[in-house]
Amino acid sequence: MVHSQLPVVALLRLLCALLLLPSATMIPGGLSPRSVTDPDVQEAAEFAVQEYNALSANAYYYKQLRIVEAQSQVVAGAKYYLTMELMKTKCAKTTGKPKVYKEIQNCELPPKAQQEKLTCRFQVWSRPWLQKIELTKMSCN
């Protein structure tokens, strides 16, 4: 009788061990590393650059050089935590219609001696079913 229970006990132990292993999937509420090339990360980065330029008092536009790091968190939607490098361009902000992301990315950079690079941390909250995306935090240095 004891021998017939051994496979069941072993199977239960294996199942318990598997349940305790960390999961590679996104955990609701937890931060998960993301590839900087994921389309939703790219979309959040574009939005962050657009908002940075709209909110900053700089006379010139800044464009995205690269996404250094990306993480996301499942909340009521998705929150993206982005660390990005931005560079000041030669494109001056003028009154009227502001430039969109793709136009800003086409702006020329000043000569090396005049270049200004920023490292920025952005939090972008996306709720696609509401067609809402917003910049919730921004800090650059």
Curated annotation (Swiss-Prot):
A motif (Secondary area of contact) lies at residues 73-77. Keywords: Disulfide bond, Protease inhibitor, Secreted, Signal, Thiol protease inhibitor. Its main location: secreted. Expressed at a low level by the venom gland (at protein level). Residues 29-129 form the Cystatin domain. GO terms for molecular function: cysteine-type endopeptidase inhibitor activity. It is found in: Secreted. Disulfide bonds join 91-107, 120-140. Residues 1-26 form the signal peptide. GO terms for cellular component: extracellular exosome. InterPro entries: Cystatin_dom, Cystatin_sf, Prot_inh_cystat_CS. The record marks 29 as: Reactive site. Belongs to the cystatin family. Negative results: the recombinant protein does not inhibit calpain-1 (CAPN1), a C2 family cysteine protease and legumain (LGMN), a C13 family cysteine protease. Does not provoke cell death (PC3 prostrate cancer cells). Inhibits various C1 cysteine proteases including cathepsin L, papain and cathepsin B. This protein has no toxic activity and its function in the venom is unknown. It may play a role as a housekeeping or regulatory protein. This is Cystatin. The lineage of its organism: Eukaryota, Metazoa, Chordata, Craniata, Vertebrata.
